[in-house]
Amino acid sequence: SHINQVRRENGVPELEINQALMDAAQICSAQLNRSHNSQFECETAAACGYPHGIGSNLTVFTTPRDQTIAEKAVTNWGNSSGHFQTMIDARCETLGVGVTIHNGIAYCYMFAGDAESHNPYE
């Protein structure tokens, strides 16, 4: 994945796909939110079967013509220091992503799971 490529380039272990986080990220992307709702994100992750803490990234953009949606999302997150730090957080070991396209707009979520941290809404 593009996220794991960024992690490799920055000397941190790759993330393993986690189905509960994949499901949660897809549910969150389908909400068509343009900003984070931490409580909804954490509650959705728990409801999908991931009871631990998560780091989350969200990016919303017009569907690109010159690169894939995954490439554009990772580029956007890489250009924002907070989102970049979430991508390379060495405490995280699992990954879930979700993409919804609505009226030519891509809503992309990334959840990085940290089994050692607590979900504040669990």
Range-by-range predicted roles:
Residues 8-17, 55-74:
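Second-shell loop/turn segments in exported
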